[in-house]
Amino acid sequence: MVNTKVTLCGVEIDNPIIPASGTYGFGYEFAELYDINILGSLSFKGTTLNPRFGNPTPRIAECPEGMLNAVGLQNPGVDLVKSREIPKLREVFNKPMMANVSGFSEYEYVTTVERLDSEADIGWFEVNISCPNVHGGGMSFGTSPESAEAITRAVRRVTKKPLIIKLSPNVTDIVSIAKACEAGGADGVSLINTLMGMRIDLKKRKPILANKTGGYSGPAILPVAVRMVYQVYDAVKIPIVGMGGVSTAEDVIEFMLAGATAVEVGAANLVNPYACRDIINDLPVVMEKYGIKNLSEIIGGAH
């Protein structure tokens, strides 16, 4: 009998599998397909202070081994998320949920977290300082250690819930930014967000995406993500949520050996809506294959 339980920032979860924000809606949509309570947790759709309609179309471009997206944080805004979306999720999900939050100023980040903080079902905040697909100041918080630490401190002051900062790979040194978030009071970091990319339509001789650039995700980015998780694990003492190209139980084990406590599944959900269920079902089989009895014991095992 294998043990898939892990403890993320003081909260025990049944397994390390968490659908990544932006690929799983608000979660309840997937409850029509399978019992989502098999998940470790879920990170619901990125939430901003005000409603956002997102970027103009086309927003998606298929690529070999992945996809580009420039959705632009489309969401109904924090007030509707709180009054409409979370209650719908609560009806079908009885575990702590992860609230993914983004913003374009310190005020927006802080106010959004403040408004969600009273929700008892939120087990963690995942603060996205790295989304590359919006116009405005959101990206700047994740591109320097100073700004990353400042936004972490600001949000830390308004919540006692575990605070996980989501990091961008589109930086010179992700390790220094992770350390800055830790210094600012983060309880954990999640990485990586998407890699900035572009595709060009050969007939039109124009970028395919209306936004021109977008975030590249899918299996091709996994080696980059594993490398960054490995590097960050050596530099910080807080837990890491790893993500980037995960589509199999073997990928989950690889991320955990690199240093991840939990693992988010993103683009795979868009290709196969049963991806998280399949990975969770396969995990004990893969653990047996590699002689793993307790998942929590392999965290950082490749170091």
Segment roles from a protein language model:
Residues 1-97, 102-104:
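N-terminal capping/small domains of soluble enzymes
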Residues 17-20, 40-44, 97-101, 125-127, ...:
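Hydrophobic faces of well-ordered beta-strands that scaffold small-molecule active sites
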Residues 24, 100-103, 167-173, 222, ...:
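Glycine-rich beta-to-alpha transition loops that act as phosphate-gripper elements at the mouths
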Residues 28-34, 109-119, 171-184, 234-236, ...:
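Catalytic cores of alpha/beta
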Residues 55-64, 200-214, 256, 268-293:
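C-terminal helical cap(s) of enzyme catalytic domains, especially alpha/beta-barrels
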Residues 90, 101-161, 167, 175-192, ...:
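Conserved alpha/beta-domain cores
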